[in-house]
């Protein structure tokens, strides 16, 4: 019997993880909690209790709760509970019986075997349970923490529209599966993940300003990550004379000194975010080619004019 429950649990875990996981953000802690602030600890006796509920004949009460670790306080928001049948149907799926987003719900179910799944951001836990004739209380341990991300150039915060973050499980030096678990995370969003090591990839603009960093997430803590980019916003212009009007219908290529193409665009004055360094701008207009070498300094936004002569 235990062997059957074990394999059913494995099958449900595989079935739940087969779908596409998208980033979910949640306010994990109250405002003001920093990465260095531990969540206060309370004994299990302090876990909130449910008010008395009338249980109809043929039903049993299942009381649920979750916490970050043993003896930690209960999680009070952001949870999604699902109760499934313990056996798969003919199609191989586990039938969903009940779903609840309360932090500590009480579900009324007929006696029998079930599988309970709780999700909190990208963290989750699952247990097989058996309901008899008496109320059953189950507390799930979810060793999860939060990531809150932002990007800066010097002391200036990068606008949300110009930066995004991807989160990968494990270190950047590992060679395992490199699919992101959260994509295009915005500044200030809180991403809830299981505790562990993660690789953060920050993209400022769409060219070559990319910063990678490994961080450690601890259960019950919010980790604020500030990614500093050494880059600047450059506006390209093809002009007939210095300070003149930019010529329309110009095709642009930005190259490294070694000739690698960093960015291509078309327009009179395209904006491009470039990492600090030296570059060559090539402008093509009406069948003619013009070029100029230039240098990017961190935080110094400005125009790069290429003379059409």
What do the predicted segments below correspond to?
Residues 100-115, 120-122, 184-199, 204-207, ...:
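Short Pro-Gly-centered beta-turn/loop motif in secreted/extracellular proteins
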Residues 60-73, 147-155, 233-242:
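A short, amphipathic beta-strand motif
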Residues 7-17:
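Bacterial N-terminal signal peptides
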Residues 62, 78-84, 114-116, 142, ...:
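Short, structured motif recognition centered on aromatic/hydrophobic residues
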């Amino acid at each position: 019997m235990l062997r059957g429950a074990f394999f059913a649990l494995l099958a449900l875990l595989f079935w739940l993880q087969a779908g596409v996981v998208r980033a979910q953000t949640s306010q994990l802690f109250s405002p003001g909690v920093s990465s260095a602030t531990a969540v206060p600890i309370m004994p299990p006796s302090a876990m909130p209790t449910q008010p008395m509920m009338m249980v109809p004949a043929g039903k049993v009460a299942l009381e649920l709760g979750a916490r970050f670790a043993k003896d930690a306080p209960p999680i009070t928001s952001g949870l999604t509970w699902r109760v499934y049948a313990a056996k798969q149907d003919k199609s191989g799926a586990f039938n969903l019986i009940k779903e609840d987003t309360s932090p500590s719900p009480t579900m009324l179910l007929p006696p029998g075997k079930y599988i309970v799944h709780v999700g909190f951001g990208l963290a989750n836990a699952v247990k097989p349970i058996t309901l008899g004739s008496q109320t059953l209380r189950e507390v799930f341990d979810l060793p999860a923490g939060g990531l809150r991300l932002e990007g800066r150039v010097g002391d200036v915060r990068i606008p949300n529209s110009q930066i995004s973050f991807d989160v990968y499980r494990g270190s950047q030096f590992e060679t395992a599966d490199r699919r992101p678990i959260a994509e295009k995370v915005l500044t200030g969003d809180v991403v809830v993940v299981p505790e562990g090591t993660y690789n953060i990839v920050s993209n400022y603009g769409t060219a070559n300003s990319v910063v990678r960093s490994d961080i450690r997430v601890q259960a019950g803590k919010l980790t604020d990550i500030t990614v500093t980019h050494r880059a600047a916003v450059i506006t390209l212009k093809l002009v007939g004379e210095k300070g003149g009007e930019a010529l329309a219908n110009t095709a642009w290529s930005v190259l490294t000194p070694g000739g690698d193409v960093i960015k291509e665009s078309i327009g009179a004055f395209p904006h491009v975010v470039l990492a600090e360094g030296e570059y060559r701008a090539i402008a093509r207009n009406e069948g003619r080619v013009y070029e100029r070498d230039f240098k990017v300094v961190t935080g110094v936004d400005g125009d790069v004019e290429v003379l059409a002569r």
